[in-house]
Swiss-Prot record:
Regulation: Activated by the negatively charged lipid phosphatidylglycerol (PG).
EC number annotated for this UniProt entry: 2.4.1.-
GO CC terms: plasma membrane
Native organism: Mycoplasma pneumoniae (strain ATCC 29342 / M129 / Subtype 1) (Mycoplasmoides pneumoniae)
Protein name (Swiss-Prot/TrEMBL): Processive diacylglycerol beta-glycosyltransferase
Role played: Processive glycosyltransferase involved in the biosynthesis of both the non-bilayer-prone beta-monoglycosyldiacylglycerol and the bilayer-forming membrane lipid glucosyl-galactosyldiacylglycerol and digalactosyl-diacylglycerol. These components contribute to regulate the properties and stability of the membrane. Catalyzes sequentially the transfers of glucosyl or galactosyl residues from UDP-Glc or UDP-Gal to diacylglycerol (DAG) acceptor to form the corresponding beta-glycosyl-DAG (3-O-(beta-D-glycopyranosyl)-1,2-diacyl-sn-glycerol).
Pfam families: Glycos_transf_2
Amino acid sequence: MNKLISILVPCYQSQPFLDRFFKSLLKQDWNGVKVIFFNDNKPDPTYEILKQFQQAHPQLAIEVHCGEKNVGVGGSRDQLINYVDTPYFYFVDPDDEFSDPNCFKAIVETIQGENFDIAVLNSIVYLQMLKNDFLIKHIPLKNIFQGKVKLNPDNTVNHLHYIQNNDQYIWNIVINTAFFKALDLQFVNRFIEDIAVWFPIMFKAQKVLWIDVNGVNYYLRPNSASTQKNSIKLLSFIEAYERLYFHLKKVGKLADFIDPNNKIESRFWRRQAFIWFSFINVSWMKAEFEQTKSVLQKLFDFMEANGIYDRVFTNKHHGIYLLWVNRLKHFKKLVQAQPHL
């Protein structure tokens, strides 16, 4: 069978997780599937381990590439897409794993059945942390981040409902290669690189299917990139916001994103308020005030320039995010009113 889908795996210092990931790959039916690894240039054993896996399984369609310089997770995703020569592709990170041994087979059968822009799968997120660094293993939250699906009468996914009710992760979705490349989108190079691509492709997709199979087990670890907290990370968030609004304008979907009737922009920014202000506090600001003030001012300038603050944060209806929205408002006043603390 011709290869129908490429499984894209961006790697960076991935050695501790590869054995588990490889085992989950080897449980799958590879008929119609190729797997492409890209090692983001780093002097650790990851690349050699990937090559060993490739050489140990010559019967499988495995490609292993290594960058000449470090390009970040977004650059790695862009590079992986450049390698794709199959009709569809699917991202997975090497510190996660495939949950259901029938995942590949279900994806291939769906592709064989009909053409589509995007297909979404079920997911399970495993929380591996609580306060005080107490590790919890295998606490499953099924379909919390992705997988909340409402079907139309023709059994396609109501993609507006999906956008409204799911978080913006590029993993666990099957993407039509020609559809994606026609949009000419690029990932940002650091944190939350997904959002600048996820919203535009979801808005532009004409046909979205649901594949009723568990795809990725997503492991949220205390020392992973997604849980790190520092000013560099916050600046990369702003870069991602800028790219998101640029991409939405580019594909002609900004109006849908900010439409108050859709409640998409407001939900997105309330969640961002939680991410920012659940761990920023006054004592941290006092310790690093000049740096912190500069970062926060950049955030608020972006909000003002794009009308976000007035659209989202001037009403009183913020639900469970009220605490974090109020903290955002507090810091906005603090940064703009005081030259020093």
